[in-house]
Amino acid sequence: MTIAAAIDSRKAGAPARSKTSRIARVDIISDLTEAEAIWRELETRQLATPYQRFDLLSAWQQEVGPREGAKPFIVIATDNDRRPLALLPLALRHQHGVRTATFMGGKHATFNMVLWDKDFARDASAADLAALLRGLRAKDAVDMLALTQQPRHWQDYLNPLAMLPRQRSVNDCPVLTIVPGDPPTNRISNSFRRRLKSKERKLQSEGYRYHLADSDADIERLLNWFFRVKPMRMAEQKLPDVFAEPGVEAFIRKACRAPITGGGHVIDIHALECDDEVIAIYAGVADGHRFSMMFNTYTMSARSRYSPGMILMRHIIDHHAERRYRAIDLGIGADEYKRLFCKGDESIFDSFIPLTFRGRIAALAMSGLNRAKRLVKHNQVLLRLAQRLRRVFR
């Protein structure tokens, strides 16, 4: 089936719309500075996740992208009046002779999404997506789009790229849905709250407190602690330390310091502290609708037995519920602690879109590989076998 036919099949049953696309022009920009004004303007009327903020992805591109061989590949679609309708925040990599465009942010973005003009996204059609892909093919600058970890819906809007051929992502994302005004026990049960309160009382005599970092000095101090403790936690779990990869620490520090309009930072840091020690931090992105965790760790000291990470998570949930947020997620993956708070799953998908013959071969390979990974991740027998093999060859 061709991509055009696949788009049409996904639109079957939808209200009839014009066969004429509103996209009149597709441009590719390889300079963040050149794209910044349009990007920031779209942010004010966007449909996208907080992971697509310019200040977050520009920090990643400046500090991490070059070290991964990723160059800015920012696609902007405009109408006849040169009004921006969509901005694809992509990075171009050359892998095995294939020019592949992926979302900026790499493994540090839980969700990837195009920045859409909301009015355009609401009525996006098969003709619009076909025009976007046609414009990219005409540029002959990329063989394949590897668009992974996209939410199918965001803020009650359907993600227009869900009309393209897609498959479920390797991992799901546990999510807690919050109904504004509901009692706290609808978010976290009474019995679980009592267990956490009992642990919390044991910390009260030690100057225990929860806070959201709001000054540069606080942010710097908490990040210094994180980058000292996290490697020990990763080593304890026999996991690779992704935060030690080139450029990652500089990226995170830059994004955590960057303020956003209305208060807060591009990455917010929530912390639990005692008089003489940080005992847990959770850091993530927020947009007034949803808080999404990016990274966390907790103390290596004896205070870890009081479950400071769990206590902090309860504070974060209540903090955002009081501000009428509608959802909280703890990142991709099915870690057991996430299920204690997040009972639902976010529907996320991958799309591998070939634009050339070479891209078609690569898209088939990447699609098949990700399907195999998902099969292993969601089959306990295969997962245990894979984990044993990983330990043998580590």
Region roles according to the model:
Residues 140-141, 230, 324:
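Residues at helix C-cap/C′ positions in short coil/turn segments immediately following an alpha-helix
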Residues 2-25, 32, 151-185, 323-388, ...:
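Active-site/acyl-donor-binding loops of N-acyltransferases
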Residues 105-116, 167-177, 206-209, 346-349:
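Acyl/amide activation-and-transfer machinery of modular secondary-metabolite enzymes
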Residues 118-123, 182-189:
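Short, polar/flexible loop-turn hinges at active-site or ligand-entry regions and domain interfaces
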Residues 133-155:
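ATP-hydrolysis module of ASCE/P-loop NTPase motor domains
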